[in-house]
Design a protein with these regions (language model features):
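Phosphate-group recognition and catalysis centered on beta-loop-alpha active-site segments
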Residues: 2-318
Length: 318
């Protein structure tokens, strides 16, 4: 027994340290409201699955775009991701929505997922290098839909009363600039929102400057998908080891990796809230919800019928 006691003490100390590192903030008053909703990923879009395919070089558009043939053959109107049409559809259907914001060269908040616009517009261009006026020439997936700014989206959810998950996309060291701009924009509306980011500096800024805002750490299994991160960054991000600095209200974790120890500690034993992304079937959404997690979904409408959108936007039988 004397031999095992030091080992037990060391293991207990390591476990206590891990719990300290990954612990969330608990008890935010807005969670009861957020838990009433499901969240449409980049709006309740309707687009071919080929729209998610990146060019070989993300900054250089394919000619023609990979989605061009499927969009032309679509039997229903295409509603691109992160478009006003997709957000309007989500709000009118009573869903919350998740969206992405980047800061343009002249300080506007563009609602678009990628920094490089080639995938969704078929044209070259980097969000952070363009002015808002230059954005006027870009269209999403060959439709008439423009890339919206955040202040165009917020009134839709202010009117519907359904919430938004605002993902802040940073570029280089602009985390404070883009976060403060997003918060200032949100302050001008009465839409119910929370903020998330892969960049823990965003959460640290919120903790120091706007602690009343619900904040969430986005993450995934970066050990499996490095995404250009150094090994040390991959270990820290995958295992939520920066939480002790940011104390997020929730973790938004990739659904397929939700069983990782750090996630289960933070969102199980330690009482943190959890979103799962991106859920592409009613089966996955139901499984997430049975586990007490909020779902961010796409490619189907969770109304009991499960409508799937495949090439060329054929609607699955009910």
């Amino acid at each position: 027994m004397k031999i095992f006691l030091p080992v037990i003490v060391v293991l207990a100390a390591l476990f206590a340290l891990l719990c300290f590192l990954v612990a969330p903030r608990r008890g935010h008053k807005d969670w009861a409201f957020l838990r009433q909703y499901r969240f449409a990923h980049r709006g309740l879009h309707r687009q071919p699955v080929s729209a998610a395919d990146y060019p070989a070089d993300p900054a250089v558009p394919d000619v023609p775009p990979r989605w061009a043939e499927d969009v032309a053959a679509a039997a229903e109107p295409v509603l691109p991701e992160n478009s006003l049409a997709a957000f309007r559809r989500a709000a009118e259907a009573g869903f919350g929505a998740e969206l992405d914001v980047h800061l343009t060269r002249d300080g506007r908040l563009a609602v678009v997922h990628d920094s490089e616009l080639a995938r969704v517009t078929g044209r070259a261009g980097s969000v952070e290098k363009l002015t808002w006026r230059e954005f006027g020439d870009y269209r999403l997936l060959g439709t008439g839909e423009k890339i919206p700014c955040l202040e165009e989206v917020l009134p839709l959810f202010e009117a519907s009363g359904t919430p938004l998950v605002v993902e802040i996309k940073t570029c280089g060291a602009n985390f404070a600039e883009v976060t403060s701009a997003a918060v200032a924009c949100l302050d001008g509306f009465h839409a119910r929102c929370c903020i998330e980011s892969f960049d823990p500096r965003v959460l640290l800024w919120l903790r120091r400057n706007r602690p009343e805002i619900v904040r969430g750490q986005l993450s995934m299994d970066f050990m499996r998908e490095p995404n250009g991160l150094r090994l040390s960054q991959r270990i820290l991000a995958t295992n939520l080891l920066i939480d002790f600095k940011t104390r997020p209200d929730f973790i938004a974790y990739e659904f397929g990796a939700r069983r990782r120890l750090a996630v289960r500690l933070c969102c199980g034993l330690l009482g943190g809230q959890e979103f799962n992304w991106t859920l592409r079937s009613m089966t996955d959404l139901a499984q997430a919800e049975r586990g007490g997690r909020l779902g961010i979904f796409e490619r189907f409408v969770p109304d009991g019928t499960e409508t799937a959108f495949e090439k060329p936007l054929a609607v699955a039988a009910k």
